[in-house]
């Protein structure tokens, strides 16, 4: 028959193994939740990009159809865009560096 010390040691070993398993399961759960969040954020970014493309297409169409609308947008872009490559895309003058 096993002594009390052996029973205690066996119980402690089982408790350690259970704690290890709990830790592994929590890590697995956290990974699954992180993947879900990443997937959700990717979908939101995709939707945001799609919205920007569609709005941009509408604006470009409006600019092509009406000269006064085009000029208003160009005036706004001139004030809004600061990067040289962005300004060049719309054939806006690139300000000289100070």
From Swiss-Prot:
Keywords: Conjugation, Mobility protein, Plasmid. This protein is essential to promote the specific transfer of the plasmid in the presence of conjugative plasmids. This is Mobilization protein MobS. It comes from Acidithiobacillus ferridurans.
